[in-house]
């Protein structure tokens, strides 16, 4: 069993297998399930992700009216040929947004590692899929690779916005995705670790300040940035760029930063964007006197 990224990389290198395989073996050992059962469960997760992306790209809106339709706008912009960024990058952004718009609309998603950060991993996977043309098996391996790094973060820091801010949610998801992209693209275990480190370094200090306490603003768009950050970091790692600070130390730094954050910036909607005049106005429009939630034409008391 591995406890940190250094041990994960060493196991992969010593056994001459992918990080995904190390994660599968650990799941077999811990869960008592067979390899076939574990892979089947991850395949089910992949199917849920596919369906969420597809639904989001058809256009969905949340009941509050705060979010929705942006994934379609981005896809249309890509098709216009006017996009300044690369197609893979923007495709990942649109699919990350699509997933989180489905989440905000109370649809079914797969938490990777949380519902609020659920767009980054599938967004990047289904975007790079268009370029790399992986098999279904390789796509499932992608998720196991991401899971391995998420496992380390969850056990050595936090994946909770309430505990560590958005750096712990979208930041962790972005690092997980970057590492998985590297392995899918043929990179080494060490390069995957470098990608995770590079990604997470650029998300340190990101606060969790959801407007009205809902996982919509700015959460949906932060998933877009998490996806673009992951692809950029993966490319850097594949190019040979390394992190001066080892991955495990970056993760620990994230943990310490999260501990030093005031509670107003950890999912309480008491600070940051949630406390802006517009943020407070939107909260009032949605919740009114605090006892009634106004969801477009639906009122829940």
Tell me the role of every PLM-derived stretch:
Residues 101-126, 167-174:
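Glycine/serine-rich anion-binding loops at beta->alpha junctions
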Residues 117, 135, 139-142, 146, ...:
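Hydrophobic alpha-helical segments and helix-packing faces
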Residues 122-133, 181-186:
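Alpha-helical support elements that line or immediately flank enzyme active sites
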